[in-house]
Amino acid sequence: MAKEKFQRTKPHVNIGTIGHVDHGKTTLTAAITGVLAQKGLSEMKDYDNIDNAPEEKERGITINTSHVEYETENRHYAHVDCPGHADYVKNMITGAAQMDGAILVVAATDGPMPQTREHILLSRQVGVPAIVVFLNKMDMVDDEELLELVEMEVRELLSEYEFDGDNAPVVAGSALKALEEVKAGQLGEWSEKILELMAAVDEYIPTPERDTEKDFLMPIEDVFSISGRGTVVTGRIERGTLHLNDDVDIVGFKPTVTTKVTGIEMFRKEMDEAQAGDNVGVLLRGIKKDEVERGQVLAKPGSITPHTKFEAEVYALTKEEGGRHKPFFNGYRPQFYIRTTDVTGSVILPEGVEMVMPGDNVKLTVELIAPIALEEGTRFAIREGGRTVGAGVVTKIIE
């Protein structure tokens, strides 16, 4: 029989495992693939395979991340797991692996630990919509009361960071025991817990809105003028869909201007529409070449506004990662590389924070010298003389 062509009929969701070091994130990832593999919905990935995460570069920053794929009856998942805590911080801040939801792994033997809190905070800061909890290492706990206590602590922690601590699903099990069942080819009570966890993920983590359905946005990379036709801007559509004759805003640096799209071109062909991911040239009515520049964006009218001041969660690269050798202080003035351009800005550190050392992550305030199209969740790099020294994500617009 001919091999079936891969058909994406199920909705696709990106998730990841988060939690304190050694609480069993990678073991759980292996257990999920193993249990689902027995159900014919995944390929088994063993622990070492996942733990030896390949290096990736995102915005000039090296991150170790493992990606596995699997399916449930209802959905197709891409799952990310990071070996080290610093990799999580970098991953979440750069958005290297966007998460539509997360599985928080907490060892029932330990309860919430410092990185448990930090990963929940980061998830809040970078806009992860929902968290499902897996209480791991249940085979080592025989005290029912202790379990209830740990569950209560985790729920309180979720609520503290504005997740739905009261209603978040909490599943207790043992990733290691489930893996042992998988290896023995005998799915038993521990594997059932993994299936219960995945049923909770299926139900509780919302299906993300597809990029093509979001409000149109395209960062401008280049500007040309075509004699007799007008001005063309080029770039890759970040989200949404653009149609011929749509109105668009040109946002950034100068007061926002609205204009009409009189042509869309891709691979030298005229098109009626283009969507997220496409590299296109867009012809704009009545716009002169010097009225538009790299670093501005084309956007659905009214959907995004220019700002100069915002709060951000930032990771400062270590010296080994090519970052600064020394800390930076209040009033630090680097370039902020936002979408397609560098803009100078100054840094205001929170009260009580004297300086930021290479390798730290910190919440700070940025004031740019020129207004740029920004919103919560916009990612940026921090650069000095073209060299990346940090990464950040906008967490709150101030003005």
Curated annotation (Swiss-Prot):
EC class name: hydrolase
Binding site for GTP: 19-26, 81-85, 136-139
Keywords noted in UniProt: Cytoplasm, Elongation factor, GTP-binding, Hydrolase, Magnesium, Metal-binding, Nucleotide-binding, Protein biosynthesis
UniProt EC number: 3.6.5.3
Catalytic activity, as annotated: GTP + H2O = GDP + phosphate + H(+)
InterPro entries for the chain: EF-Tu_GTP-bd (IPR041709), EF-Tu_GTPase (IPR050055), EFTu-like_2 (IPR004161), EFTU_2 (IPR033720), G_TR_CS (IPR031157), P-loop_NTPase (IPR027417), Small_GTP-bd (IPR005225), T_Tr_GTP-bd_dom (IPR000795)
MF terms (GO), sorted A to Z: GTP binding; GTPase activity; translation elongation factor activity
GO cellular component terms, A-Z: cytosol
Subcellular location: Cytoplasm
Similarity comment text for this entry: Belongs to the TRAFAC class translation factor GTPase superfamily. Classic translation factor GTPase family. EF-Tu/EF-1A subfamily.
Role played: GTP hydrolase that promotes the GTP-dependent binding of aminoacyl-tRNA to the A-site of ribosomes during protein biosynthesis.
This protein's name: Elongation factor Tu
Organism of provenance: Nautilia profundicola (strain ATCC BAA-1463 / DSM 18972 / AmH)
Underlying gene: tuf
